[in-house]
């Protein structure tokens, strides 16, 4: 079973410029490892994306542009926190990437 993600867990982005990004939200009242449990729809920190990853012509500069308002878009089908599916290592995020870091002592299936 995969480890449960938390606020501050790393995600890979699946694109250039910022190759990793952190989960920027979590439960205020369900805590693991002193951090809030991450859930589906929790936000990711703002980051940049390569223009070429968006199918935009390159050059001109800048190579990287802002890529805000991204979120966790997958979670457990059977384990919920605050009525939302918990996020786990391997679950997908809006940026074509996955959660890559979680609390190894807390696992959840489904």
Language-model region placement:
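Intrinsically disordered, low-complexity proline/glycine-rich segments
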Residues: 2-110
């Amino acid at each position: 079973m995969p480890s449960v993600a938390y606020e501050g867990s790393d995600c890979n982005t699946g694109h250039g410029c910022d190759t990793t990004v952190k989960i920027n939200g979590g439960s205020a009242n369900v805590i693991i490892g002193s951090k809030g449990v991450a859930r589906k729809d929790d936000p990711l920190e703002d980051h940049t994306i390569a223009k070429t990853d968006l199918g935009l012509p390159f050059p001109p500069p800048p190579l990287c542009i802002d890529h805000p308002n991204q979120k966790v878009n997958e979670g457990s089908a059977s384990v919920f926190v605050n009525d939302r599916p918990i996020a786990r290592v391997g679950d997908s995020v809006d940026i074509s990437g996955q959660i890559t870091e979680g609390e190894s002592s807390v696992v959840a299936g489904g």
